Amino acid sequence: MKRAPLITGLLLISTSCAYASSGGCGADSTSGATNYSSVVDDVTVNQTDNVTGREFTSATLSSTNWQYACSCSAGKAVKLVYMVSPVLTTTGHQTGYYKLNDSLDIKTTLQANDIPGLTTDQVVSVNTRFTQIKNNTVYSAATQTGVCQGDTSRYGPVNIGANTTFTLYVTKPFLGSMTIPKTDIAVIKGAWVDGMGSPSTGDFHDLVKLSIQGNLTAPQSCKINQGDVIKVNFGFINGQKFTTRNAMPDGFTPVDFDITYDCGDTSKIKNSLQMRIDGTTGVVDQYNLVARRRSSDNVPDVGIRIENLGGGVANIPFQNGILPVDPSGHGTVNMRAWPVNLVGGELETGKFQGTATITVIVR
């Protein structure tokens, strides 16, 4: 029996693992970041918008151009990856909103194509590596699109994220002026990778900080006595009974009058309202509204005093005199007024008249 020769062979294939390297990217420098800010200066919020549940969009972000400065070595071909994270930490009334202050929540919306690789609008929420924004474009100095430190043929300048919008949501109506200090709302972070993998969360570096600042004003329309002038008539006074200094005429009955106001429904507004009364014809010793001046020397000789019957205050000053406003925004203040002799002795005959203004102020 003839045996066939056996030939054996072995193919050895060596294997090695290739790992993608990655790192952070800054704006203009590897540690740099730029700021885009929405400035809402001197914006008036009318009454129809100043209600819980109303939304409005803030001003367009101001932006500057910059260039990528990634930590990769010069000449390296890399891809760019982005991650956008909220800076505010207190969640708002629903997902995607964060608490800006006691009256406003804010939502950040990235616009499609405003960041390379972002194909649809995206609301900024808590991000993980699974929500990274990836772009398949390869950047390198060889193609005049270098992004690594030391690259001379660079990509850009750019202003990614400049079309981001902020939506403000009224959680609690407010009155008067609201100052929003410069507040970072979200941050666009960047990283590079030279393979198919994903950068780790620690690789990402701040590129763009998105912030808001400014002033909002919410005026409140108040009607006092339906807009009519409040007139208090003291009638005819016997001059012989009007001689005691800083006193009303003997036997005089003070005149009661009402100040009726309607500021709409303020029950859900965190601010408080007050009415302030100020004399416009002059004031003596803060409590006496000048109603007449003596013809011989222009010295005030007749004054008017008032008190709040419901507040237990005997005299209301005519300089920053404060009257209460009910939290509901409407009501009536019961007042009393009387004339006083400011100089003592018998006064000249004739008319007297004093005027004051009432202003509703916000606290």
Curated annotation (Swiss-Prot):
Induction cue: Expression is negatively regulated by H-NS and subjected to cAMP receptor protein (CRP)-mediated catabolite repression.
| UniProt keyword Signal present | yes
Pfam families, sorted: Fimbrial (PF00419)
| Main localization category | other
Q: Which SUPFAM superfamilies match?
A: Bacterial adhesins
Q: Is Signal among the key words of this record?
A: yes
Locations listed in the record: Fimbrium
Give a Gene Ontology cellular component term annotated to this protein. Answer: pilus
How is loss of this gene reflected in the phenotype of the organism?
Answer: Deletion of the operon under classical laboratory conditions does not result in any major effect on E.coli capacity to form biofilms compared with the wild-type strain.
Entry keywords, A to Z: Fimbrium, Signal
Q: Which residues form a coiled coil?
A: none
Q: Name one GO biological process term.
A: cell adhesion involved in single-species biofilm formation
Signal peptide stretch: 1-20
UniProt lists the family membership as follows:
Belongs to the fimbrial protein family.
Protein task:
Part of the yraHIJK fimbrial operon. Could contribute to adhesion to various surfaces in specific environmental niches. Increases adhesion to eukaryotic T24 bladder epithelial cells in the absence of fim operon.
Further facts: The operon is cryptic under classical laboratory conditions, but is functional when constitutively expressed.
State what protein this is by name: Uncharacterized fimbrial-like protein YraK
